């Protein structure tokens, strides 16, 4: 006999919202931070061992794939930090209570989520601009 029971809740009723994006990105950036820590560990081990190991590590980090991975790792770190601070504020009850219970339909409520994504991107670009200026000899 076929199962005729309804599926509940069905995925078709959900609308993609910024908090779903934040939750997914928070988990993915946490995973990427763990994987990126392997790259940092490789660098520490290479620095503590021979000069050849360090030159291999530096060559990898200077390649286009190394730079992309380091850029994404930086963004992951800063997004995870910003989103974690937002979680902390929500855990402390900031903007929760009877006066704010219907804010889920408020555009300002949702724009705060997009602000976290934007702030993390701006901070990442700022870090890399400062880093490239420092490496390039533009800063004293």
Named regions from a protein language model:
Residues 1-140:
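Membrane-embedded alpha-helical bundles that constitute the cytochrome b-like, heme-associated redox core
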